[in-house]
From Swiss-Prot:
Task of the protein: Major role in the synthesis of nucleoside triphosphates other than ATP. The ATP gamma phosphate is transferred to the NDP beta phosphate via a ping-pong mechanism, using a phosphorylated active-site intermediate.
Pfam families on file: NDK
The protein, known as: Nucleoside diphosphate kinase
Record lineage: Bacteria, Pseudomonadati, Pseudomonadota, Gammaproteobacteria, Alteromonadales
SMART domains linked to this entry: NDK
Cofactor: Mg(2+)
Cited CDD domains: NDPk_I (cd04413)
InterPro entries: NDK-like_dom (IPR034907), NDK-like_dom_sf (IPR036850), Nucleoside_diP_kinase (IPR001564), Nucleoside_diP_kinase_AS (IPR023005)
NCBIfam families cross-referenced by the UniProt entry: PRK00668.1
Domain of life assignment: Bacteria
Amino acid sequence: MAIERTFSIIKPDAVAKNHIGAIYNRFETAGLKIIASKMVHLSQEQAEGFYAEHSERPFFGALVAFMTSGPIMVQTLEGENAVLAHREILGATNPAEAAEGTIRADFAESIDENAAHGSDSVASAEREVAYFFSTEELCPRTR
């Protein structure tokens, strides 16, 4: 098994509903370790930069507006096959299709406000972690 890092966002809808602790509990219960975490309120420029790959998609404006509508939690998670493990915990992008017991099934309202984001690959995780965290901010567990 490979120890990986992945990037995670708890989106404005879930932060506003005080689900941060419950979501962190899901990560830790699944064996993922939080090695960096902070709350940020994205500027339009930050949101547009983070989601630049979607800039030509019709939903881009609404996505940026949503992601700047309130604070978010960003975190780096570490564990065995962390990218896949985290995505399984999140559930399907559309909460109506998410398996029972997943974060999106339990905490999301709609496909547009779906509670959380997770990297889709190790390469994406590396890019996304670097967007929000310096190397010095990452604190691998030593015990």
